Amino acid sequence: MKRFPTSAIAAIAAAALFGMASNASAQAAAPAGCSDDVPQRATRGNTEFVSNSQTVRGLLYKPTGPANGAAVVLLHSSEGLSVDAHSFDPHAIQLAARGYHVLVPNYFEARARQVPWNGRDVRLWAEAGHAAVAYMGTLEGVDPARVGIWGFSLGGFVATDGSAHPDSTARVAVGVGTGQDIFEASRGRRELPMMLIEGYSTFPIISAATMRELAANLRRRGATVEVQMLASPERSMTGQVWCEVFQHTRRFLDANLLPAAAPEAPAG
């Protein structure tokens, strides 16, 4: 499968979102970069779904080998998909190569970004996340009861706080570099597994303390929250940090979205 340089990925993503990606570029694999990468047996294409009468476009990754029946939605940060696409892409490819269906939506198409954002903005973004999860559950090869949602920074807050709402059908939620400094937590209550990931490399405003405040809030609202601190000493979101983030992400998704392995029969 043809490989594109990392610098080309953001351009490919932007082209796909505007309907200009050719079949060849949509299926081009991202460069490998982590020590545990598997062969890139996955495709990338463009798709769209509707949230509150707004069309939301995104990138859809599918396994070319056997699907595992699970799916995950990846939500970008406040910088937008055009900035985060090059960081997400190789890891979305790796998830798909392992059997997951993966959607990376441009959820700002459901509600344009403004600074500062307000409660209505956050609510509409959360509802776009709900719609993305529901959309993934309609795809062939996906069990609608095994769809998770993941987000980075603002996207992490939208994914976790939004999934605590009764309207969400996400089976699990993961937030990376997020906390209550993003926005005031909502009041919805829902029981589901969540994981919050924090490290030295996340934005200064998102400290471990504010992440733990969000974890405590989500627990009070019914979630079972795992807190994972990154081991990497890197002070920026380097490739090494992203590898560690997605290693923890895959472990959590596998544990909560995939069937437990059958115990081996006793010898003899």
Each language-model region and where it sits:
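N-terminal cap/lid segment of alpha/beta-hydrolase-fold proteins
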Residues: 27-66
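Short substrate-entry loop that stabilizes the transition state in hydrolases
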Residues: 67-69, 77-113, 204-206
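The conserved beta1-alpha1 loop
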Residues: 73-79, 198-199
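Alpha/beta-hydrolase active-site loop
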Residues: 119-140
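Alpha/beta-hydrolase fold nucleophile elbow
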Residues: 142-152
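Gly/Ala-rich beta-loop-alpha elbow adjacent to hydrolase catalytic centers
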Residues: 151-155, 159
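The feature captures the conserved acid-bearing segment of alpha/beta-hydrolase catalytic domains
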Residues: 172-226
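C-terminal catalytic histidine-bearing segment of alpha/beta-hydrolase fold enzymes
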Residues: 221-268
